């Protein structure tokens, strides 16, 4: 074998699937699987069997094409170690950097408000239904839970980060186990309600509107955009020098594809299992009660007449505890991102970017007071969580995940090779449909 053949053979071997690629596949998957998944079955099952089947068809393309578009934007910067802010500044100047900072902050902060409402409702329903305790004042419960989390964050942030990383896989495993455990309780209610002669495509409860609103919850639930920039930087540093940018782009696409398949398989199986256990009417009731599907399942098993099996009792309590842990995990993870983003905005606009004018402790205190204060106000007001996701959380995520990369493809020379592709149209349409939810909610 010649020296050239040896080099090619060596590079081919080294460029094949690596352990780090598996690690990142699982990392992207784990980032997306959080408390948002607990609301997806409610919206997906709200309209019955046909809309959720259509969402099943759309799930993988939404997860894969949208995140691949964002990854391509991150890959387009000249500096392999440059994050998304640096890349956007390179393409659009300092103004672009400010815009992306605002987008990141406002993409994450509403999620904290959503989790503030969710954890309050989940705790109160667990307290009243599973523990059979008298009802508590909502404002007090929300304040107590937020102060508890603020205390943990303030005095044990490093420990909390470690705990969060350990909780990812037990949470995913518990979702799969619950999905499997619900199979003995499946019924045909959702199938019996399908009336092909009386299907409405349009209108408030029509299939098209239900799927349209479902797209926003899919964008929210299938979202690992916060980690895409770090993922791309890691892969560029690992592969680009030896194998080139095109190879790195293909590798990133391959990893995103596998993570998306895992994510869709787990979340859709969970959604179908919940829907076959409950019914569209139950899902509507869960939406009205403003609680995640696991809390509703716990109440459902608590209300079973007659002697309950040990399994049903375990599921009743386990579902609520898993929901609480999932929301705590998601809250802490998003809090750290919100704190970092708000610190950056306060530093940029309050202190003109001069880090010497303010201590990190003071900066953290200012940001924490705003974050926890605004979260308490929203948690006390108790807006409908799905409406909040559809009107705020998902549209802002879509602007970052879908529309920003599409705009960059049209304007940035380094992304010109991606112009005119059909998948660009798909990503743009998904982004616009998600943002148009705001208009639907207003009118």
UniProtKB/Swiss-Prot annotation:
Transmembrane segments: 22-42, 44-64, 97-117, 140-160, 163-183, 207-227, 261-281, 319-339, 366-386, 389-409, 423-443
Record flagged with keyword Membrane: yes
GO cellular component: plasma membrane
Gene Ontology MF annotations: L-serine transmembrane transporter activity; symporter activity; threonine efflux transmembrane transporter activity
Major localization listed first in the record, in broad terms: membrane
Pfam families: Trp_Tyr_perm
Function: Involved in the import of threonine and serine into the cell, with the concomitant import of a proton (symport system).
UniProt protein name: Threonine/serine transporter TdcC
Natural source organism: Citrobacter koseri (strain ATCC BAA-895 / CDC 4225-83 / SGSC4696)
């Amino acid at each position: 074998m010649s020296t050239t053949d040896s080099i090619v053979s060596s590079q081919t071997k080294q460029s094949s699937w690596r352990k780090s690629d598996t690690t990142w596949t699982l990392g992207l998957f784990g980032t997306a699987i959080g408390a948002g998944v607990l609301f997806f079955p409610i919206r997906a099952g709200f309209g019955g069997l046909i809309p959720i089947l259509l969402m099943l068809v759309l799930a993988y393309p939404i997860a894969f094409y949208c995140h691949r578009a964002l990854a391509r934007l991150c890959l387009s910067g000249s500096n392999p170690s440059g994050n998304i802010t640096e890349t956007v500044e390179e393409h659009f100047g300092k103004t672009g950097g400010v815009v992306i900072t605002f987008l990141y902050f406002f993409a994450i902060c509403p999620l904290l408000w959503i989790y503030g409402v969710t954890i309050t409702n989940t705790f109160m329903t667990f307290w009243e239904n599973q523990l059979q305790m008298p009802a508590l004042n909502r404002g007090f419960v929300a304040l107590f839970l937020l102060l508890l989390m603020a205390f943990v964050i303030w005095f044990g942030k490093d420990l909390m980060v470690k705990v969060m990383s350990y909780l990812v896989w037990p949470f995913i495993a518990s979702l799969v186990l619950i999905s499997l455990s619900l199979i003995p309780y499946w019924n045909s209610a959702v199938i019996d309600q399908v009336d092909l002669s009386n299907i409405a495509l349009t209108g408030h409860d029509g299939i098209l509107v239900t799927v349209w609103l479902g797209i926003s919850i899919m964008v929210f639930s299938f979202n690992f955009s916060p980690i895409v920039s770090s993922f791309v930087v890691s892969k560029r540093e690992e592969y680009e020098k030896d194998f080139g940018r095109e190879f790195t782009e293909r590798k990133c696409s391959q990893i995103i594809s596998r993570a998306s398949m895992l994510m869709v398989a787990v979340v859709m199986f969970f959604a179908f299992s919940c829907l076959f256990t409950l019914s569209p009417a139950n899902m509507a009731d869960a939406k009205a009660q403003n609680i995640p599907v696991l809390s509703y399942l716990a109440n459902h098993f608590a209300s079973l007449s007659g002697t309950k099996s040990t399994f049903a009792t375990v599921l009743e309590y386990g579902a609520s505890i898993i929901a609480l842990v999932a929301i705590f995990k998601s809250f802490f993870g998003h809090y750290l991102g919100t704190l970092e983003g708000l610190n950056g905005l306060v530093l940029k606009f309050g202190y003109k970017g001069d880090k010497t004018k303010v201590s990190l402790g003071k900066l953290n205190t200012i940001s924490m007071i705003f974050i926890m204060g605004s979260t308490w106000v929203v948690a006390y007001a108790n807006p409908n969580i799905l409406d909040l996701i559809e009107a705020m959380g998902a549209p802002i995520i879509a602007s970052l995940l879908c529309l920003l990369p599409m705009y960059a493809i049209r304007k940035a020379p380094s992304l010109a090779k991606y112009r005119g592709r059909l998948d660009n149209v798909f990503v743009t349409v998904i982004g616009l449909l998600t943002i148009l939810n705001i208009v639907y909610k207003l009118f």
